[in-house]
From Swiss-Prot:
Reaction(s) catalysed (UniProt annotation): isopentenyl diphosphate = dimethylallyl diphosphate
Species the sequence originates in: Rickettsia rickettsii (strain Sheila Smith)
EC number(s) per entry: 5.3.3.2
Protein's recorded name: Isopentenyl-diphosphate delta-isomerase
Span of the signal peptide: none
GO CC terms: cytoplasm
Location within or outside the cell: Cytoplasm
Amino acids binding substrate: 11-12, 99-101, 162
Superkingdom assignment: Bacteria
Length: 342
């Protein structure tokens, strides 16, 4: 057990370091570069009237932005999560925590995840890999993770390709959907299912919605490639070559968003995966997202300072607001109907 615990911590340290120092982007594009808003030269709007507010999980957001799940479990991760939480609270946006599996075996790591005292008002998301349900994690333990950080929802992340290219990855993905359904019905709060950078297909979205999942985070291709992250962690050339061969794998984020929105007009969708700016976020809202998530650039900023992170989030919000004004969109509902060309 101790060996497994140490491996969890080591893996989390590796993931932070690799994401900060190596190029681990997918060679696929997110797809949003193919969408262009029709510029409105006479918007008849006052910038001060632009309204980016929305609601998510019953809470108000000042902008439709999620700091996507990144890390936890280590001292460096604690510092990063504290900065993320401080800035999320200040900016009025949502935040996801990194995988909390380590908390089930290392209770002391709670201090690296517990940020509710820093961010009392924002939607806060607990997180664990869905495949862990095939390796002994129970619905009761999922509720424990939620309670431990006073979360508003639980993310069950789907990372099959990452696990299969990871030296110590889990390989049994059989009969997982019934276990997801069981967690959905057991928990006192909503379950979000999230991909980690390869997208959700129409078929998978249909299955998850049927299982009672309340929110989908499509996390398509175009951003971080976790198989490429694992290529840097490989302990031999064969593992490296296997992982590296999947750098262009997945469903581009735009395609995944269209697929999932076709399945349901109503389910809340978080769009992440390769979004680089508030302009990309605006495009995601236009195509059908409720909120949009970013991770990589926030991680780099948060590893440096709270002020740099806040500037990065201000940049995203300002880009979003300018896009709204230049499309004649006073609200996010207006933005969802803005003119575009493909």
């Amino acid at each position: 057990m101790l060996k497994d615990q140490n491996l969890d911590i080591e893996r989390k340290q590796d993931h932070i370091e690799i994401n900060l120092t190596q190029n681990v982007e997918s060679t696929l594009k997110s797809g949003f570069e193919s969408i262009h808003f029709i510029h409105n030269a006479l918007p008849e709007l006052n910038y001060d009237s632009i309204n980016t507010t929305t609601t998510f999980l019953g809470k108000s957001l000042q902008a439709p932005i999620l700091i996507s799940s990144m890390t936890g479990g280590t001292t460096r991760a604690r510092d990063i999560n504290y900065r993320l939480a401080q800035v999320a609270q200040k900016a009025g946006i949502a935040m996801g925590l990194g995988s909390m599996r380590v908390l089930l075996t290392e209770p002391d790591t709670i201090k690296t995840f517990a940020v509710r005292h820093i961010a009392p008002d924002i939607p806060l998301l607990a997180n664990i890999g869905a495949v862990q349900l095939n390796y002994g994690v129970t619905p009761k333990e999922c509720q424990y993770l939620v309670d431990a950080i006073k979360a508003d929802a639980l993310i069950l992340h789907l990372n099959v390709l990452q696990e299969l290219t990871q030296p110590e990855g889990n390989r049994n993905w059989e009969k997982l959907l019934p276990k997801i359904r069981e967690v959905v019905h057991y928990l006192s709060i909503p379950v979000i299912v999230k991909e980690v950078g390869y997208g959700l297909s129409k078929k998978v979205a249909e299955s998850l919605i049927d299982a009672g999942v309340k929110v989908l985070d499509i996390a398509g291709s175009g951003g971080t490639s976790w198989s490429q992250v694992e290529a840097y962690r490989a302990t031999n050339s064969l593992q490296n070559r296997i992982a590296s061969s999947f750098i262009n794998w997945g469903i581009p984020t735009l395609d995944s968003l269209k697929m999932v929105r076709e399945v349901s007009k109503d389910i809340p969708i978080i769009t992440s995966g390769g979004l680089k700016s508030g302009i990309d976020g605006a495009k995601a809202i236009r195509i059908g997202a409720n909120i949009f998530g970013l991770a990589g650039q926030f991680l780099k900023a948060a590893d440096t300072s709270e002020s740099l992170l806040f500037e990065e989030i201000q940049l995203i919000i300002e880009q979003l607001k300018i896009t709204m004004l230049c499309t004649g969109s006073r609200t996010l509902k207006d933005l969802a109907k803005a003119e575009i060309r493909l």
